[in-house]
Amino acid sequence: MKKVAAFLFFQLIVLQAVFCQSAKTVSAKTATVNGHPAWIEQGNIYEVNVRQYTAEGTFNAFAKHLGRLKQMGVQTLWFMPINPISKVDRKGTLGSYYAVSDYTAINPEFGNITDWIRLVKLIHNQGMKVIIDWVPNHTGADNRWLTEHPDFFVKDSTGKAAVMFDWTDTRQLNYKNTVMQDSMIAAMKYWITNTGIDGFRCDVAWNVPGTFWSKCIGQLRKMKNIFMLAEGDSAYLPKSGFDAVYPWHMFHMMEKVAKGERPAFALDSIKNEIDAIYPSNALQMYFTSNHDENSWNKADYGSFRGAVHAPFAVFTQTMPKGVPLIYSGQEEPVLRAIPFFEKDTIVFNKLQRAGFYKTLLSLRKRNAALSPDASFTKVNVGDSTALYAFVRQKAGKKIFVILNLSDKEQTITVHDKSLHGNPYNIFMGTNEPLSNKKWKIEQWGYAVYEYK
């Protein structure tokens, strides 16, 4: 206990010193809307895989892409874990980003703490935000806590630190240990006070107790109005302080609709489930791909193949209570699974989807009808097994979305007179007349109309 107490005292002294040096960064307050940082309300998230993003795989090399990402409309950069990776029981050559050996250090493959602080400042100078991936459920197999604080870990039947699932390169943390909890919170505070980040994406958040999250997030928000994203879809997560969660059920239903296994209107059942289960202000991070789905399940090049991707991407960008995600390389697009444990550089060359994403992200930023709390009304425009159409409205702003979620051309009729007129087609860049006259929409087609 003396060793633990000394360790915590040292951490406190370090954090206080850093806090004093970085008080201007930490004390900066941002507006809150619906319980969330205002900047995320009509924002978006772009997941950065530093290892694979450039040939160098460093912070400094990634920084060269900031201008391009800013121009595309990216607002929040989520960096996959930037901590050192354990060498014991390492998987593959480079190991899993999620087997952390030291919570308050930088992966030397990416650079050093000076490089990271410089990158955060560059991102902030571009008007963007930074969140980092955090791994609170488990550590790497040679994390320093294993020797310094063996009581921080769950024990298996042999008395050794336990392994969860097939994650043999990790060791399971024990959340019954309150000293461990305080140490975890102290480590998270380090990144806010020392580097000025704007929040965390928390890995396997669903396996960490809500009581911890309430305590942790409460303390962190006394320092800065941060954004908190949970990997998980349990209702207790937003109730414990998280701003956003993963809508896994919606993602899997999207996959089924894309394969023709379920009708388009099946998406409504998941939306209704979300409305019923979560607090009214809870945000959903909608996506067509992320690092897990790409590496292990062929997203989006396999699950939303070719032209199938676009209408579902529009869906993720325009749904209520949503914050859309774009994963590294989707704007190219990368048409392969990016390895999890080996080097496989993404080549940015054609950027075939960049204009498509820019159009959507620009609309989200400028139009209040895509605020999380803007109204959502389904619209009948034809065959509901194939067509998914809806209107979003807020503060006199209105967006009309039509998606053909099928591999066949469909006939559309807009009966609602309130939608008639000459709205702006954001993808065509022109105003188009809408009436009750029938018209065709191609397979996997999409249209988004902005009423001004």
PLM regions with names:
Residues 78-92, 133-142, 203-209, 232-236, ...:
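Short, solvent-exposed turn/loop segments enriched in Gly/Ser/Thr/Pro and often Arg
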Residues 24-29, 33, 193, 203-287, ...:
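Active-site-proximal helices and loops of the catalytic beta/alpha 8
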Residues 1-25:
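Bacterial Sec-dependent N-terminal signal peptides
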Residues 131-132, 201, 229, 287-288, ...:
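Generic enzyme active-site microenvironment
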Residues 20-42, 46-78, 84, 117, ...:
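Carbohydrate-interacting/catalytic domains
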Residues 279-304:
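Active-site clefts of carbohydrate-active enzymes
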Residues 26-46, 51-75, 81-195, 213-222, ...:
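Substrate-binding/active-site clefts of carbohydrate-active enzymes
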Residues 74, 196-197, 242, 321:
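A structural motif
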